[in-house]
Amino acid sequence: MYNILISGYYGFDNIGDESILRTLVTSLRERIPDCSLTVLSHDPAATREKYGVEAVERMSPLAIARAVRRCDMLISGGGSLLQDVTSSKSLHYYLAIIRFAQLLGKKVFIYSQGIGPIEKDADRRATARALRRADGIVVRDERSAALLAEIGVPAE
């Protein structure tokens, strides 16, 4: 069984984010029928019920650490997760999950992300360090690809 952990802004009833999750779950199940999916969620019970996946509390460091240790692959996305306009705290939350997975030798994919704006130099450097080590990056717009190129990260 191949274990995939999905990190994003899930379980908040945001229609766009939940649509991305539904599409991602469906696509993964079609392409990797023998996969086990776990989602980091604000409302794990609702996420389990809606999508038939395992779900854990997205703000529990212990639950996140366990989920990352168990996974073979982390998918971070979609949405506009990697930006510092709302706050650097949110950016560093998502980067910490990515970096922890990388530290443990997990495959890391950035999926359907709108990257930026990232205004602070320290945030740009932290983002570049994490994303340069990603196994794959797919952004959802040209502006995101341009920002990644600007900070030295190749994107598809």
Feature locations, PLM:
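Active-site-proximal region of nucleotide-activated glycan assembly enzymes
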Residues: 103-156
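Aromatic- and Gly/Pro-rich donor/ligand-binding loops
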Residues: 2-119
